[in-house]
Amino acid sequence: EELHKLRRIWATQALNRFDVEAAIELARSPSPKARAGALRALYYDAPRTEGLLPVAESAVSDPSGQVRLWGVSLLAQLASPKTVPIALKAMDGIEADDFLDFAVWSICREHRDRWADEMKEKGKNPFANLSQLLFASSAIGERLGADRILASLSDGKIKDDQTVWDIANWMANEGSPAHLSKLLGLATETKSVTRQHAYMNALLTAKKLRKINPSGTDRIASFLNSENDTIFGVAAQLAGLWKVESSRPALEKILNDDRASPVRSKAVLQALISLGGEKTNSYLNQLFGDPKTPYGRKAMVVTGQSKAQPILAARRAVKLLQGAPGGKDKFGIYAAFLGNRGATRALATEISQANLPEPIALQGLQLAESSPTRPKELIAAIQKAGGLKPMKMSLSLSEMA
């Protein structure tokens, strides 16, 4: 019966005799399909119809995502200054929905003048909560309220860690260098590992995606003393990407320590490679050439350099493979070169001019043959260096018998 009512409403609309009252009544139907259909009908006549704001406001809190979507669509056709604050309620208490998110995102942009200008003038959040402000500000690509939000963080007014992460992620995408500098300051002030991670992860994202640095980057060095591996790892990445030369001694000290965990050693190595320059090259040359440096640490240097310096790394890789303990590549040397086309070519060139023990050559051949790229040059070079015959890809009839 509800769907019959909906068809009658659509029929009156098609005949330019739209029954608005019937549509509003049907928008309160027990059937979600009928409610959504009624809102759709009201959407098309909204510019010529008064009193639809309460209908749309009720719809954006409906249990049905489809009804909420049409509620937001209806709001987009209305002239009320409250359309955006009402539309943002549609994302509360419901699972993530890309279509609904896009509809709310769009109305934040299309009705920007109804809320952004007021906020700039009054300096107050026009929405129900901070998350809504972050969403709306991201939609229009502006840093509205950023200073006020950072002040709230600094004053300890924001207690929820998830909200802190939301703010940090927003700053990563929208914040200015000055805002990022404040984030770094907040990271140094808090004792919460979760919040340190949130702030530092935002700084890392801003660097990688937007190439933006805060001021006072030397402050990151203090986190190289962190007992938390995650915090340490992000700090090491930032020290390298920000070119914080003052962190170099601390990084080298960790890499020189045989007791350092593989996780920290790898993070430090990548940081030093990111720092770059003659100092990094000299240090890594010394580390690789030192007879006291463990085989695993040398392998880490080679795999770490495979992308940045593939020719040098390939030359060193061959030396390590020739002396691999037990004739096995236990440290992923082959895999590191197979993951990069330029590095693969460099390794093929170096191996073609050398000899490899049969076990290590066989392992490399198996890895190269099973690689998605199946590099022919490397396969041929390994076969030659190890004195191996080409692997059979199929059996003859007699062999299958």
Ranges and model annotations:
Residues 1-401:
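Long, ordered, helix-rich scaffold segments
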